[in-house]
Each structure stands twice: as C-alpha cells, then as structure tokens.
Amino acid sequence: MTRKNQVTKRPSHFMAAVGLLILSLALRPAIISIGPILLDIRQAFTLSFTQASLLTSIPDLCMGFLALASPLLAKRFGVNGTIIGSLVLLGLGVVLRSRMESVSGLLFTTFIIGIGIAVAGSLIGGWIKEFYSDHAPMFMGIYSTGLSLGATAAAAGTGALTSATGSWRVGAGIWAVLCVTGILSWLCLAKSHTPPTERRQSRGSVRLPWGNPKAWLIALYFGCSQFLGYAMLAWLASSMLQMHTSAIAPGYLLSAFTLIFTVANFGTGAIAGKSTDRRFLIAISSSLTVLGLAGLAFITTIAPLIFVASTAVGLGSAFTLGMTLPLDQTHSPQQANAWTVFTLFIGYLIAAVGPFGFGALRDLSGGFALPYLLLTAVAVLMLLLTPLLKPAVELRSEMDSAAQIPDLG
C-alpha cells in the first residue's frame, strides 16, 4: 500500500472531531464529580481533608505513572483497542466505586478509574499527530474542550443528582453512561482507521526525551498547570462553602469555573493555529492565573466569581497550550507519543501534589488562605517559565512543509 493510500484512509475531519469530543467527555467526570460531594464522602467514611484529597490525587498519579505503559499496550493491542479497553475499565471503576462501603474499596476503585483515564488520555496526542498533524492545535483544542465539557457536566450535575436522590452514590456513579457513549463513538471512528497505519505506528521504538531540557520545561509547565487545575477542581466548592464568601452556591462557582475553562480550551486551540511561538499566549494565560489565585488568597470576600473566572481562563488556555507544546517539537507520531507520554508522566506526578498539598495545608493551618497562597506561588512559577519555552522553529517549519500534502480524507 502506498503512502497516499494510507493517508486517504484516515477519518474525515468532521467524523474525527465528533468522535474525539465524545470520547473526551468521558475522561474527567469520574474525578470532577468528587468535588461537589466531597463533604458527603468525608462524613460517610470519616475522612480527614488530607485523606479525602487522595480521591483526586490517585488518578493524577495513575495518569503520570501509567502514561509510560500506554505505548506498550498500544503496541500489543493497537491504539484503538487500547483506548476502548481503557474506557471499559473506567466505566466499571465508576460503577464499582459508587457501591463501595469501605475506605480501602473506595481508594482501590479510584485507582482503577485512574488507570482507565491514564491509558486512554496518553494515546490521544499520538493519534492526533498520526492523522491530523496539520491541524494539531485545533484537534487538541477539541479534545480539551470535551474534557472540560465533561467536567462542567459533572460539576453542575453531581450535586443536583445527590440532592434529588439523597445519595452521593447516584451522583458519583451516573457518569459511567459517558463511558458507554465514548466506547460506541470510538468503535465507529476506528472503522475509518487503516490497519497498516497502526502496524506501521508500532514498529519503531522512540525513547522518551529524558535528556532533553526542553522536554523537562514543557513537562514542568504542564505539571504546574495541572497542579493548579486539580487543586481547584477538588477544593473550590468545599472551600467557598466553608469560607461563606459568596451568595453564589459553591456548586455553581465550580460549574462556572469548568464552563469558562471549556471556552478557554476551545478558544486557545482556535487561535493558536500554526504559530511558531506560543509564549505570548502562555504569558497571558499565566498572568490571568496569578491574578485570579491571588484574589482568592487575599480578597476572597470581594466578587470571588471574578477571580474564579480569571483563574479558569488562564488554566483552560494553559491546558491546551501544554498539550500542544509536545506536538510542536516532533516530526512523527512515534515522537509525538514519546513526548506526550513524558509530559504526562512528569506533569501528572506534579499535579498529584496539588489536591493533596491543598488538603494538607488546610488541615495544618485550619483555613484556606495558606492553601490558596501556595497555588498563587505555583502560578507565578508558570509565568517565570514562559521565556524559556522557546519554539522549535526548525522542527515546526518541517512539520508545516509536510502538512502541504493534500487532505483527501
């Protein structure tokens, strides 16, 4: 089969966008749904703030460590088979966790959930690079948007379902439905993938960029953004409720955060285009994040929605940029997978400290000012990293030249 035939048998842009969006909807509710019902779970299992933070930190750790295993699984079972299997595992984990009666069972099923999210999520970058390198920022924006829409639905719906049914278990378990739709969608999308492409993709072995300083900078930037994002998703609603800072219900503040985060995801993907230098957008997003978190740390009683919105715009943009930066540095799907896996591994190990550190500081200090001050300091670090994230101009130019192949898909 010629290269031309291999290229023409990729999914169409529209079909791929829809399939990717539906898949991504399933990958965050299992984590985000914990935030609105965290106090209920703490009371049901008599957990401390530090222990409760593990419900968010465990998936982050999985997304870090298991990112390393994803390429091996994809080589053995194919990218599509691995993604579908991960969604099955995720759905089972969500259902089982909602039925657990012990702390150990709660944490174990959270670990299962983390495996499903980790393996599926770490393969998306290479999939985009394989079929849509000429539109990588746009497709990464669609993926990020789907993650955020799923998070928004979980943030808004979990509390409402819990109140309506009188049980946090319904609010935690209902999101397995999105795993079913994700599986069906990806099965349809997989039919448009050419088997020779997957076999070609798995032949080569590309090492992770352990010795590349740029890879470490990108991973650190991504890790800081996820440190902040998961800390906010885990603790925003609970902290606002206990601080009595706003007439707006804490659940709606969390929903506003995730909704604005979603808009920033998509908007950043749309405007990033094929620019060879993303540092201007990185600087803007980091500055907005610093402004928002500093407001929550020091003047929370004055219009917290404004500071929540500023933080959401900054972190929403940072996620799309952080996931796109590894693709900017690479020539091939194999390299893209290696850089993405490395970024996720380092990044999510850093991210796992966010919810845990926030909860631990809350236990130690008895308040939320110190935890939000920690988040502000991490946001400042993101801003300081901006000048160091120089573009790989030569690599990008070669990618743009390759993108001139006509799109016949």
Predicted regions and their residues:
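Cytoplasmic helix-loop-helix junction between adjacent transmembrane helices
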Residues: 109-146
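Helix-to-loop junctions at the C-terminal end of transmembrane segments
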Residues: 66-78, 264-277
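Conserved MFS/SLC helix-loop-helix module at the cytosolic interface between two early adjacent transmembrane helices
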Residues: 65-104
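A late C-terminal transmembrane helix in Major Facilitator Superfamily
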Residues: 330-368, 375
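Extracytoplasmic gate region of multi-pass secondary transporters
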Residues: 35, 213-255, 262-265
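Helix-breaking motifs and short loop linkers at transmembrane-helix boundaries and internal kinks
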Residues: 46, 78, 99-104, 133, ...
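C-terminal transmembrane helical hairpin of 12-TM major facilitator-type secondary transporters
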Residues: 278-325
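Helix-loop-helix hairpin linking two adjacent transmembrane segments in secondary transporters
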Residues: 134-135, 142-190
